[in-house]
Amino acid sequence: MNAVTETAATTTDMPLPFVFTDAAADKVKQLIDEEGNPDLKLRVFVQGGGCSGFQYGFTFDEEVNEDDTVMNKNGVQLLIDSMSYQYLVGAEIDYKDDLNGAQFVIKNPNATTTCGCGSSFSV
């Protein structure tokens, strides 16, 4: 398990591998509180599929796997497995609630193309 914290950039002068926004962390915390299970963590992953080749996935998980990278933010944990990590380096994981609806969104600088809905991409 690789642990990443908000203070990693200031203590090691290394950039964080991805950004987990306050809005996303706060929404995850709200959803975990609604579930009543404080052991839940948000797992973000990449899998084959979608109209552009890869698609993002979000799920809650109680387990931290040996190859997971863990980011702690505002009292919640974000998990990314080692295969997905390579596609998410530099990405911003955010939560938006606007006229288009409420959803988690990923801004990924590694994506060369994305589909219209933003849920799939290619590299």
Curated annotation (Swiss-Prot):
**How the cofactor binds, per note?**
Binds 1 iron-sulfur cluster per subunit.
User: Keywords assigned by UniProt?
Assistant: Iron, Iron-sulfur, Metal-binding
Residues recorded as binding iron-sulfur cluster, renumbered to this chain, are: 51, 115, 117
Q: What GO MF annotations does this protein's record show?
A: 2 iron, 2 sulfur cluster binding; 4 iron, 4 sulfur cluster binding; iron ion binding
Q: Which Pfam families match?
A: Fe-S_biosyn
Q: Which cofactor does it need?
A: iron-sulfur cluster
Q: Name one GO biological process term.
A: iron-sulfur cluster assembly
- Of which family is this protein a member? Belongs to the HesB/IscA family.
**Function statement:** Required for insertion of 4Fe-4S clusters.
Q: What is this protein called?
A: Putative iron-sulfur cluster insertion protein ErpA
